């Protein structure tokens, strides 16, 4: 039995409102030509107004660009009232797909008490707005706050049982760890599509930030060699980082991944390069 052709999708983030949207609008117009399966729009924890950032950008992508859109909703700093209000705002603009997250903890900022975990948010959405399609986040190398992967996968099963129709992974650089994670999910009875999160490394500063914020991510020897060899050669590091991401994607598609979710960092040129190198592998038909 043949597997369905995998999807290629993109993640973008809303810019700081003080900067304006001109740059991201131009990037998204360029990305539209690549016919992504969907685009997800992130949301900042307790920093910017979700309606003026995430909802507004999701509205533009869904309605002006006619690309299916998923809005991120990190709820640890939101009340039930604010989540209900955000769902209504999204409903008004026709965005009915949510990536439900707990969200990162911000030092010295007290979380709200309504949603301790993503599962709490998923259950609330299913109760308040059952017509929304919910995507969950997952971590092939374990959630940073989880004591072990067994407990992490048990919690992931709770997310799926609560109403997630698919999953998107944290970025990773070691495909073997992703495949091992997939196998463990199958054994745990998790049978929804898992989209692999891929982020091309384009410069040294990006790599250093990533290593600082994602300490749970394993760096294969081949990846470390790229960082070491081209540490002082920005052009070569960018080329090698893109090539590494393409190699990951080709391998993932060969192994029947459900989809690849590209963390674009709002860079249309990155999306274009990846698309040009891999577009024949993907089906760009929207699920609608």
Give the residues covered by each predicted segment.
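C-terminal helical cap(s) of enzyme catalytic domains, especially alpha/beta-barrels
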Residues: 178, 268-287
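Active-site pocket-lining/capping segments in soluble small-molecule metabolic enzymes
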Residues: 19, 113, 117-139, 187-247, ...
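Active-site mouth loops of central-metabolism enzymes
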Residues: 7-23, 69-81, 135-151, 229-243
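Conserved, mostly hydrophobic/aromatic
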Residues: 11, 39, 90, 159, ...
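Glycine-rich anion/phosphate-binding loops
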Residues: 23, 75-89, 112-116
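Glycine-rich, proline-tolerant flexible connector loops at the mouths of alpha/beta enzymes
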Residues: 35-57, 104-113, 165-178, 264-267
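Conserved N-terminal beta1-alpha1 strand-loop-helix module at the mouth
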Residues: 2-41
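Glycine-rich, positively charged N-terminal anion/phosphate-binding segment
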Residues: 21-30, 47-65
